[in-house]
Amino acid sequence: MALAAEAVVPPTTGSAAPIVRITALRKSYGSNEVLKGIDLDVRRGEVIAIIGKSGSGKSTLLRCINGLEEFQDGSLSVDGKPLLHDSAMAMRELRQRVGMIFQSFNLFPHLTVGRNVMLAPTLVKKRRAAEAASQARRLLERVGLAEKFDAMPEQLSGGQQQRVAIARALAMEPAVLLCDEITSALDPELVGEVLRVVESLAVEGMTLLMVTHEMSFARKVSDRVIFMHQGRVHEMGPPTSLFGDPQTPELKQFLSSLHD
């Protein structure tokens, strides 16, 4: 296996430690090993797209970073703090630093849009209702839904619901935002409105790791693209190199299959 990362990924320099550091990470479900020794450093403000076939371990990697999945070997730290599954306090701190947006929107149907965005800051960060409401209004404006504060989720399109989910994740002021195929459940005409919001976050300097099938989007906004294959980081590099000059047969075949 040829790992392109060695040649094309600039090392972290100076005192800027990586905001996410993953070392020799292994994750199994029973006898099925789905992550087979992942090594990855993510710099603050970096945008990384993760691509690959279904079952290659992409979503599992994100769920490990967020603490939703427990790994068997290796280490993972966020902002210098190790992920410790046996420490409830460490896990709470991690989840305040790492936001995650899923394929399904998972909005609370009985709460208004504004209340959905306010919920975590009031419960977890103990913010006053007025302060949380003000923040929710700002975030809804940021994702283009300022007028939907009092609407119910059922009144929104899928694209609008996913933008509310983005606002909800941002309400916890995460240092890192994980996006797990967040457009895959949307009708094609709604994908663009969600991707525009994600692109604006990238421009503003949010650290983003996103599993995506939107290759043109990955090429446009990413600093690095990771191609995962059979539980490993198979190739990694800038989008121009990875898409324009794939080094392994597996990546060449994957990219070719997208155009069949």
For each feature predicted by the language model, list its residue ranges.
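ABC-family P-loop ATPase nucleotide-binding domain
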Residues: M1-R26
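C-terminal boundary and immediately downstream tail of ABC-type ATPase nucleotide-binding domains
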Residues: A2-A5, H229-Q230, M236, T240-D260
